[in-house]
Amino acid sequence: MAPVRAAAAKRWCFTLNNYTAEEEAKVRALLPGEFHFAICGKERGEQGTPHLQGFLHFKKKQRLSALKKLLARAHWEKARGSDHDNEEYCSKENDVILTIGEPVQGNRSDLAGAVAAVKAGRRMVDIAREFSEIYVKYGRGLRDLALMIGQKPRDFKTEVVVITGPSGVGKSRLASEMEGSKFYKMKGDWWDGYSNEDIVIMDDFYGWLPFCEMLRLMDRYPHKVPVKGSYVEFTSKKIVITSNTHPESWYCPDKCYLPALFRRINKWMYWDGLRFEDVPDAMKKHPINY
């Protein structure tokens, strides 16, 4: 059976370490008529290795075999991101040796890359950063696609951290300094702007979410939260709740079974007058994390 040939593409990027004068001359001699846009810059890696970093947007599709004839020692990959993104990347050390044409605006390969990112379950904010021009033009369609095909539902226990103490001791700051992307949940039903961040922060909480909703958020099973016009999967790994009051005061014990809330709390810290410490068992009206 004949070997499968790699698919051709118009947009390629390459890295060529320890380039020779002859190889540099080949890059400088590329013919303008073959490209929509091309750029190549000189760089030095973290270990001081000199290399050429290039991006070529051909007018006709090219296979890897043809590119290897051009620069045999180079590492070639199909390009991601927009032409503008690659222009910035290849010129970041301000030593450009080749520029042909102008970056192509919003090419279809960028759109295909953004769609693939949605299908892979990437956060919309990350897609917007990587494919900024595409997002400006097709953002609504990408969001609709994400809502239609859905994020992978949660299949793990969301960690719940509670931080209590008086005003001005640094509860909000402690929450904000935790590692990971963050979404600040405001009072109200809607989660507009939620993009599956690592951490959801509920600042100055005093029971303004329905008890049954809070239990579902703190659990391990699939759950959707409402955005205007639809629902999105809740997949955050951690919920951080700051409050001036203890959890037993958040909900009415006559109407809500508070042990169900407490057992979903993984960690509870309080201000002891000097620092934040784990709450001693004697202060817990119900056991946590069981």
Curated annotation (Swiss-Prot):
Q: Which gene encodes it?
A: Rep
GO BP annotations, alphabetical order = DNA replication
Instruction: Kindly state what the record says about how the cofactor is bound.
Output: Divalent metal cations, possibly Mg(2+) or Mn(2+).
Its subcellular locations are: Host nucleus
Q: Which residues bind a divalent metal cation?
A: E43, H51, E93
- Quaternary state and interactors: Interacts with the capsid protein; this interaction relocates Rep into the nucleus.
InterPro entries given in the database record? CRESS_DNA_REP, Helicase_SF3_ssDNA/RNA_vir, P-loop_NTPase
Record note on domains? There are 3 rolling circle replication (RCR) motifs. RCR-2 is probably involved in metal coordination. RCR-3 is required for phosphodiester bond cleavage for initiation of RCR.
Q: Which UniProt keywords apply?
A: ATP-binding, Covalent protein-DNA linkage, DNA replication, DNA-binding, Endonuclease, Helicase, Host nucleus, Hydrolase, Metal-binding, Multifunctional enzyme, Nuclease, Nucleotide-binding, Nucleotidyltransferase, Transferase
Catalytic site positions = Y89 (for dna cleavage activity)
Residue window of motif RCR-3: 89-92
The protein depicted here goes by the name Replication-associated protein
Is Cell inner membrane there in the keyword field? no
At which positions is motif Nuclear localization signal?
4-13, 60-80
